[in-house]
């Protein structure tokens, strides 16, 4: 990675907005995005990413996706188990807190994914269009494994796998990502073109504004 590419990343509108948010928090500014607006922006970005991934997925075949999806699923199971063990042994955390930490490591940050995808796009780095589908795949097993660990070791021996899976797959982020994927995958091209002015063109601007708030939150914590 050359210096010009690094500079281009740090001077991108999204990163600059994040830095403005950090500075605003450090100087004790009253800059805040209302919770309802923050929630709306988050939902918009997740659905827009899913939509874009679904369109790319429609041009892929099953053979291209199978092994990456299998590897992603395996990582989603192995990572929280390793994180739990390290949190217990090295971090000296109790079972419930270690399981909560394991869920964070086993799951995935959609915001980080969006920023990475945005960087790859701006840097003209080739990447598979079905990566968004893998994001949805990775979101589920980490949460399921962590909830099962918390249930068994936290004293809830009667934990039901069906209930755990239901909680994981009905989460807001998973519904929005997979919903967007299905729309992008199944909708006709004319219909997608009709909504592109809402879910494609404004994406970069919405992401930049969203990261402004994330900068405030990150610096405040």
Q: What residues fall within each predicted segment?
A:
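Metallocofactor- and cofactor-centric catalytic cores in central/energy metabolism, strongly enriched
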Residues: 39-42, 48, 84
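Short, functional N-terminal and low-complexity linear motifs
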Residues: 50-55, 81-86, 214-220
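Active-site-flanking structural segment that lines cofactor/substrate pockets
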Residues: 45-62
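Juxtamembrane membrane-water interface segments of multi-pass membrane proteins
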Residues: 29-31, 35, 55, 91, ...
């Amino acid at each position: 990675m050359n210096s010009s590419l690094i500079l281009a990343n740090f001077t991108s509108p999204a990163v600059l907005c994040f830095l403005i948010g950090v500075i605003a928090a450090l100087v004790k500014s009253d800059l805040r995005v209302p919770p309802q607006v923050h929630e709306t922006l988050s939902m918009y970005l997740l659905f827009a990413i899913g939509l874009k991934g679904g369109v790319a997925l429609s041009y892929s075949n099953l053979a291209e996706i199978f092994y990456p999806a299998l590897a992603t699923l395996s990582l989603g199971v192995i990572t929280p188990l390793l994180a739990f063990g390290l949190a217990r042994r090295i971090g000296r955390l109790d079972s419930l807190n270690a399981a909560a930490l394991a869920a964070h490591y086993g799951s995935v940050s959609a915001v980080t994914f969006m920023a990475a995808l945005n960087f790859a796009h701006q840097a003209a780095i080739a990447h598979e269009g079905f990566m968004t589908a893998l994001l949805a795949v990775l979101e589920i097993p980490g949460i399921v494994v962590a909830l099962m660990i918390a249930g068994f070791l936290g004293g809830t021996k009667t934990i039901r796998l069906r209930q755990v899976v239901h909680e994981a797959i009905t989460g807001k982020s998973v519904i929005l990502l997979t919903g967007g994927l299905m729309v992008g995958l199944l909708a006709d091209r004319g219909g997608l073109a009709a909504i592109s002015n809402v879910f494609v063109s404004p994406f970069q601007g919405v992401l930049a504004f969203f990261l402004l708030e994330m900068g405030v939150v990150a610096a405040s914590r």
